[in-house]
Amino acid sequence: MKRRQLITAMAAAGATLTLPARAKNLGKVTVGFTAVADFATLFIGKEEGYFSKRGLEVEPKFIPLNPSIPAAIQADSLQMGGPTPSVYLQAVDGGLDHVVVGGAGMTTKSSTGVGFVARAGSGIKTAQDCVGKKIGVPGLGAYLHVSFRAWLKLAGVDYSKVNFIEASFPQHGD
């Protein structure tokens, strides 16, 4: 283990020792989540009593569109939330004083957990076929929107010629 990693690990371990004592003063915490599997741990933790054992009353709150999370935190409708990295970075770049508590996932160039689905009969079979089409994403500027634009660019398609609209997952079939 490198020295920097060791120091970081020790600091993180030391910081976690104080969490139970500090958590007892937090009371109710409303946590915003979107309809993705990453938030399963939130529900498991609540069901298993992880939060209540530490003096926290955690209330999960469904947020249909990921880019709404920073604004909801700013307005104190949520105390915590899970925006995608691109949404978080845009919020902080825009002047919101938010911090990251912890990460929930990791994506690499070889990740295959995300895909693009087109309705039968849409005529969409390649990236080029998306030009002039209306594509629904669960948040403009969010992870799937940014990733889709990157995929189009890699395929040589000008993503500005694709009409992206913001739609929550249940609406994508429409």
Range-by-range predicted roles:
Residues 24-168:
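Short, glycine-/small- and polar/acidic-enriched structural segments
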Residues 5-23:
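N-terminal export signals
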Residues 168-174:
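Short, intrinsically disordered, charge-balanced linker/junction segments flanking boundaries
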